[in-house]
């Protein structure tokens, strides 16, 4: 049997077996500019087909679609988990040169280095968490 078919069969089998307990906690939608492709309507429809109990929306550095996502999930009987994927770096954005480059570990190129930019997924546990995340994103 072809390897890709085995992988696909395994994934579908896993999802079918665990559909009531599997939740995507890192998902970009149309609101992750240049990165997310799925439209909310299509996401909700597919989630209903798979029978997932909840979905997180973690678009890059924004919550532009949070209200629409929350409303559509609730209407479909899916628990919405609001969040965002943020970036953080050492230093302050107000300090010139604060964004330092760091050598890439394991790189063959002695000159290769990358900015120290890290990604972090933040999920809202409740309304207070939502308010805090909104404040954080507004200040960033």
Residues covered by each model-derived region:
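Phosphodiester-processing cores and adjacent nucleic acid-binding clamps
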Residues: 2-140
């Amino acid at each position: 049997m072809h390897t890709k078919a085995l992988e696909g069969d395994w994934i579908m089998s896993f999802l079918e077996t665990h559909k009531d307990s599997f939740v995507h906690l890192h998902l970009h939608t149309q609101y992750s500019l240049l990165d997310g492709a799925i439209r909310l309507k299509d996401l909700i429809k597919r989630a209903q087909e798979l029978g997932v109990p909840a979905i997180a929306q973690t678009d890059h550095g924004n919550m532009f679609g949070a209200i629409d996502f929350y409303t559509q999930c609730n209407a479909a009987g899916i628990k919405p988990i609001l969040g965002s994927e943020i970036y953080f770096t050492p230093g302050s954005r107000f300090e010139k040169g604060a964004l330092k480059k760091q050598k890439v570990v394991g790189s063959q190129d002695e000159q290769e280095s990358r900015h120290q930019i890290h990604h972090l997924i933040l999920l809202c546990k409740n309304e207070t968490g939502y308010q805090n995340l909104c404040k954080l994103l507004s200040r960033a």
